[in-house]
């Protein structure tokens, strides 16, 4: 699965779909370049929590659905909701639904646009696992909406169900942190949200506490960001949305130029770009 995703991004997604919007192209870059960098995180969580045939999983902010696909291949029944990026959700449908371009990977998969309420189905048993894999802890305010989202999702699960949150590791363990500072430098310095900030030790625990969840373990996973070339690295990082404020404050060309310069120290002699990173995850339970 991962090698297929790695190879697909070598041709720019815009070449086969000239009418695609910028949002669609960025979503495609996310799905084909950037999202696979988090595969070690998804794998570690699924392995530790023994995701399988008995798992009824609700993915919050499921994006283009790679984590759901990986859970489904382990036998889980998966449901994903996405309220921020319909373009990514469209790609998740390609991956997961029977009539999608990727084939029938998961017969028991549901995908909806919206928040947790969109996942309500009284004909099905409650969920026993909730995931929020979009990492927090690198931009000011990036966790503000997560606790309320988890509060709304918790009633859809059995009492004591597993909940997984993800975040960036310590800045000194995340090489990409230095690159993300470009976004802050180019964006409006007066912005209170959307600027880079170092992750803090208890970011995930604080969110869990605000959401009324009971922490039940944590872990760290190495998630290196490796790209075939500089163009892929720039496109992949831009697809995260972390540079949107910088693009709005300046322009896309300037951001690409500054980002390329920031990535240059991580360019290898063979043309690949490599940055070591560590991500955290917190396992909690509903009360």
List PLM regions with ranges.
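Conserved class I S-adenosyl-L-methionine
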Residues: 2-55, 85-88, 98-99, 105
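Conserved Class I S-adenosyl-L-methionine
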Residues: 3-5, 23, 27, 38, ...
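Class I SAM-dependent methyltransferase SAM/SAH-binding core
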Residues: 58, 64-120
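Class I S-adenosylmethionine-dependent transferase superfamily signal
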Residues: 71, 152-153
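A short acidic, Gly/Pro-enriched loop at the edge of an enzyme's catalytic core
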Residues: 117-130
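Residues lining the SAM
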Residues: 132-136, 166
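A short, conserved alpha-helix within the catalytic core of class I
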Residues: 138-152
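Conserved catalytic/acceptor-binding region of the Class I
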Residues: 154, 160-226, 244
């Amino acid at each position: 699965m991962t090698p297929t995703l790695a190879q697909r991004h070598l041709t720019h997604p815009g070449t086969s779909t000239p009418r695609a919007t910028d949002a669609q192209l960025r979503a495609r870059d996310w799905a084909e370049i950037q999202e696979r960098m988090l595969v070690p995180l998804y794998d570690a969580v699924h392995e530790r929590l023994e995701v399988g045939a008995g798992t009824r999983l609700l993915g919050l902010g499921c994006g283009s659905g790679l984590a759901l696909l990986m859970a489904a291949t382990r036998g889980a029944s998966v449901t994903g909701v996405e309220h921020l990026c319909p373009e990514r959700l469209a790609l998740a449908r390609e991956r997961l639904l029977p009539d999608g371009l990727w084939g029938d990977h998961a017969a028991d998969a549901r995908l909806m646009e919206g928040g947790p309420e969109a996942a309500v189905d009284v004909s099905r048993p409650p969920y026993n696992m909730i995931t929020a894999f979009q990492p927090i802890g690198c931009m000011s305010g990036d966790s503000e909406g997560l606790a309320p989202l988890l509060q709304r999702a918790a009633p859809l699960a059995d009492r004591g169900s597993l909940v997984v949150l993800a975040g960036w590791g310590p800045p000194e363990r995340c090489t990409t942190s230095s690159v993300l500072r470009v976004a802050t430098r180019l964006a409006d310095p007066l912005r209170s949200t959307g600027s880079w900030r170092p992750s803090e030790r208890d970011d995930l625990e604080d969110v869990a506490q605000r959401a009324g969840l009971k922490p039940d373990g944590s872990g760290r996973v190495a998630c290196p960001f490796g790209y075939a070339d500089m163009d892929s690295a720039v496109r992949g990082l831009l697809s995260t949305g972390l540079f949107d404020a910088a693009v709005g404050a300046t322009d896309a060309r300037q951001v690409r130029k500054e980002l390329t310069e920031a990535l240059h120290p991580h360019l290898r002699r063979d043309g690949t770009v490599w940055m070591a990173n560590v991500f955290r995850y917190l396992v909690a339970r509903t009360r």
